[in-house]
Amino acid sequence: MKKYSGVALHVIVFVFLFIFLRIFSEYHFYCVEQNQLFQLTPFFIIDKLMQPGGLAMVLSGCLVQFFILPNVGAMITAALLTSLGALFWAILKRIDPRSHGILWAWLPVLSLLFVQWDFNYRFQGTVAFGMMLLALYLVLGIRNFIPRLIASLFASLLLFGLAGPVSLLFALSMVGYEAMSRTPRWYYSAILPMIVLILGGLCVRYSVIGEYRFVFLPDSYYYFRLVPDKVIYFSWIAFYAALVVTCLCKNKESWAGKKRLALGISQFIILGLIFWKGFDLYGEQKSYRLKMMDYFTRTEQWDRILVSCKEPTTNQLYLCYQNMALARKGILADEAFKYTQHGPRGLMVAWNKSTTISALLSDVYFTMGNVAAAQEMAFESNIGALCDGNPRMTQRLVQTNLIYGAYPVAEKYIAVLENTFYYKDWAKAQRKFLYNDEAVETDPLLGNMRRNLLAENHLIQMDGFDTDLIRLAEQNPSNKAAFHYAGVFYLLAKDMTRFKTLVETYYGTDLLPSLPVSFQEAVIILSEKDPDYWKRFGVSESIVGRFTDYKRQVLAGRNNSNALPGLMYRSYGDTYWYYYMFK
């Protein structure tokens, strides 16, 4: 009966974790998958296995590549964490069969759950932790000290080579276990951490690994350019604390009856409180919306981006996604002011050299038709990815090199993607464009983007963001996105002088055969008292009538200036007039 109750508990934990992660972390797993590029080739896998911690790296890469599939990321993570909890509980039971400290068994698992939400954490750390637990469970099954010590020695060496820094945690755990169990000649086990320390020192000495923290600490399972938050150490601390407490309480009088029930309930309550507080502190809910928009961009679900942007926001990243979605739908200049706007940075955020912003800017530049800038940002995002590249940015590099006719480079990236699980079919479909200008030029996407290529080279934004856009539009008049971005840029900056020049120069041409809604509203501002000027640019009667009502209400409420913005927003918050006057 006890056996089945334990299985039932683990099933309940798995189901709970899966449902929870499915609801609150679905888009996080999609982003984690984008942070690595795992190739299913012998050369790639052997290269990883030759590194300290290589097997954990390969196993985690194999698992994470499936995170692109709906629900799979939540399922794999829930299954792995539940398995770790069950394994550690079995270890504690092996140390003290009468142990009722289920709290201690699940604290390391909760700590590992919290660190999963860190975008810069590598899943390898969780896999390596599981490998360490498995080794500990097997070694503790050996009753005699000397055989157990020999097995521990081999396990330490194997863990160092296959799992990385967890080998030191394993070695220290065995020393602690032997000491607290008062094993005769327990101090022989001190050789275990000594050997790990010597191996680690040699790795640093001969530049196999760059820093000691990557040899002995869980920092190795984090993006190497950053210093991890303290939460990454919690699982190690909780694990060792649980081991110490269980060893010290071994052979103590076991609680029974109501005391045992009360102990179990109190432990579950404590675990629940820790879970709730940990999710609040480390759940990364502030960045979750950004991860969601990144996924919608990747899958071209522009309407879902716009739905998520209906609520007012001051976050320039959200606005950048929003305006890109409008541009992709061809309605940026018509509907930009139906959504929240806060200046020109909502069109193009500043580059901070991070992989996330680089990927976003690559998408924005590609939307504008700026192939050179899109390629540069894709390259920056790709080389800055956590593990060997970013699949989507590698796809972008395939596209941009095909557009440029740099077929050998494109072929190299295609070959990489052909070695992956999810992207191989897409990559194979791109081979028809290699060394085939006609196929590229007749393709709706690649051909149109090739027509955006400028005849002369220019440094990006050397003459200004708007100048680059106008050059692109002049090069390819069918590229409406670039021209609309330029016009909306002037409107968001309230640069009416340049906007006037833009309209008067290009109205009636292929670039601007008619004015979009926001441009018509802005033309009225250019010459508020000259209706003939409006007619010159084809401002519709409905917009003229709406402006008349707008002006009348502004004049009626001018004596109540504090309340006027709120009053006008109700009826005219979707107009450029409101933005120009009140923002």
Briefly describe each language-model feature range.
Residues 102-105, 141-157, 185-194:
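Short hydrophobic alpha-helices at membrane interfaces in multi-pass membrane enzymes
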Residues 78-95, 134-138:
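Transmembrane-helix motifs of polytopic, lipid-linked glycan transferases
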Residues 186-253:
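Membrane-embedded alpha-helical segments of integral membrane proteins
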Residues 257-281:
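Internal/C-terminal transmembrane anchor helices
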Residues 18-75:
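Membrane-interface coil-to-helix junctions
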Residues 31-35, 49-53, 73, 77, ...:
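Membrane-interface micro-motifs in multi-pass membrane enzymes
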Residues 277-450, 458, 474-495:
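Soluble catalytic regions of membrane-associated enzymes that act on cell-envelope
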Residues 1-17, 259-268:
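Start-transfer (signal-anchor) and selected internal transmembrane alpha helices
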